Amino acid sequence: MDHIRNFSIIAHIDHGKSTLADRIIQRCGGLSDREMEAQVLDSMDIERERGITIKAQTAALNYKARDGRVYQLNLIDTPGHVDFSYEVSRSLSACEGALLVVDASQGVEAQTVANCYTALDLGVEVVPVLNKMDLPQADPENAKAEIEDVIGIDAEHAIPCSAKTGEGIDEILEAVITRMPAPRGQPDGPPRAMIIDSWFDNYVGVVMLVRMVDGVLRKGDRIRMMATDTVYPLEQLGVFAPKSESREQLKAGEVGFLIAGIKELQAAKVGDTITLEKKLPNNAGPASDPLPGFKEIQPQVFAGLYPTEASEYDQLRDALEKLKLNDSSLRYEPEVSQALGFGFRCGFLGLLHMEIVQERLEREFDQDLITTAPSVVYQVQLGGLAGEVIEVENPSKMPEIGKIAEIREPIVTVHLYMPQDYVGPVMTLANQKRGVQLNMAYHGRQVMLTYEMPLAEIVLDFFDKLKSVSRGYASMDYEFKEYRAADVVKVDILINGDRVDALSIIVHRSQSQYRGRAVVAKMREIISRQMYDVAIQAAIGANIIARENIKALRKNVLAKCYGGDISRKRKLLEKQKAGKKRMKQIGSVEVPQEAFLAILQVDD
């Protein structure tokens, strides 16, 4: 075990993490030059295109160090985005060390800080690395000062490197060996392995990426998942180097993959512990306690996804099922809307996760989707003696006002990180979104603001606005804090007196008048004129708070009258009016797809 090092790379988006991983793999001869391509570990198209890492990947590499011994280095590539923070914490807990990669020309960013704190909490040894030293605007001294200031780890021995040109790679590998500890564990004890990630393969079923903590697992063992208490025969195991290589056994300290003929991903939950089913003469028996830190992931943001054509409902269901195979944090259940027909209510970890799922559905499965406004989960305390608490994740399911004692909304702690020139506009934005400032700290030229905010205010468009008021320099991350009672109301949109359920929104009372008016005005622009008058209203319960009319199109029925008696003209006009009235009773207004997106574009 002394010759094994497990490490991962922590970095903000675009600070060069995947390129650095490529160089390390190349230096250790993991792939031939022909197979080497940019961002080897990012296997999804969407990961390459957005330049982000979503799923964890690993590479087991052999490196001959300067002391002449050969070490096995396991590089575990972690996602860097705040939505995937649970996956990050699992990847990090499988490591003893982490390389903190900071772009020498940009300094530290919010997500780097968040992931770095996660690493320090898990007791991981962090080695700072300054990347992009080949750029003319690289400022290593400032970057070191920021690392010490913001994260509070010693950056004096930070390693300068450039993943692009390949300078400093050997120094990094030596630091991994000398500065990071070897894995701890009991090589002879009962086997325990932690699932870092799992995905679905069409040929072999679920593939689990695991870190062996104690003991040995051999091909042919019967293994038990501790969270779900299910047993499977172990069919194949091995390591990724970065291409998969089969082995006969995995020993404590190693990182590799297990294949056990599991059919659905729910059985192999990220963070779960794998051990043996029972004691046999040739093994050490099952472990009694699982590894700490496993938790079920709860979705934070919900939205409805509907096919544009009702006939494509089945294809959408199949597409979601396939996506769920590779994304255990996605939740969905069927739902029916009067306006949009059959579709699904989906739960996501956060906004980026939602965008990625939508994009993958449109891209890989060729789906045309209508998405409703994202909403969060509210806790509703019902009145009366029983006073039960229900969770409402869809605005149209909110009980009537009379039955509600109080509504609680999710509050999150938000860390905003930006150059000091933009503090003013960012604070104004945070206050508009009902943020309460908790802290403000200056680190050199950078400022870190800490706010408490309702999650509902963030899910709509906070991130886009933050980027625009700070010209793209601000970064943020957030974590759930608690549920808190709030004065929120449900605003319904009525068209000719009929509720359109997919357009309901839940907003704070102070903004309800304004939001209602804005949505109604927007609808008026979008809905085309009909043969009869259309009234668009916004209502809270039975109170109408805003109204717009769309005037009817009408034919000039008097065109054929030249002069003549007024009563003749009146007869024609009355006849037209009666016809319009009859039409209005039986006609229904077609709500175009843009209307559902319009809700998202209402400014505060």
UniProtKB/Swiss-Prot annotation:
Keywords, alphabetical? Cell inner membrane, Cell membrane, GTP-binding, Hydrolase, Membrane, Nucleotide-binding, Protein biosynthesis
- Topological category with respect to the lipid bilayer: Peripheral membrane protein
> What EC number is given for this enzyme?
3.6.5.n1
What is a single cellular component term in the Gene Ontology annotation?
A: plasma membrane
What GO molecular function terms would the record report?
A: GTP binding; GTPase activity; guanosine tetraphosphate binding; ribosome binding; translation elongation factor activity
Domain (tr-type G): residue spans on this chain: 2-184
- A GO term (biological process) for this protein? positive regulation of translation
Where mainly located? membrane
Q: What top-level class of enzyme does the UniProt entry assign?
A: hydrolase
Q: Which SUPFAM superfamilies match?
A: EF-G C-terminal domain-like, P-loop containing nucleoside triphosphate hydrolases, Translation proteins
Cellular location of this protein?
Cell inner membrane
A matching Pfam family: GTP_EFTU_D2
As its record notes, the protein acts as a catalyst of: GTP + H2O = GDP + phosphate + H(+)
Which family, according to the similarity comment? Belongs to the TRAFAC class translation factor GTPase superfamily. Classic translation factor GTPase family. LepA subfamily.
Q: What this chain does, per the record?
A: Required for accurate and efficient protein synthesis under certain stress conditions. May act as a fidelity factor of the translation reaction, by catalyzing a one-codon backward translocation of tRNAs on improperly translocated ribosomes. Back-translocation proceeds from a post-translocation (POST) complex to a pre-translocation (PRE) complex, thus giving elongation factor G a second chance to translocate the tRNAs correctly. Binds to ribosomes in a GTP-dependent manner.
Per its record, how is this protein called by name?
Elongation factor 4
The organism is: Methylibium petroleiphilum (strain ATCC BAA-1232 / LMG 22953 / PM1)
Task: From the UniProt record, report the name of the gene that encodes this protein.
Answer: lepA
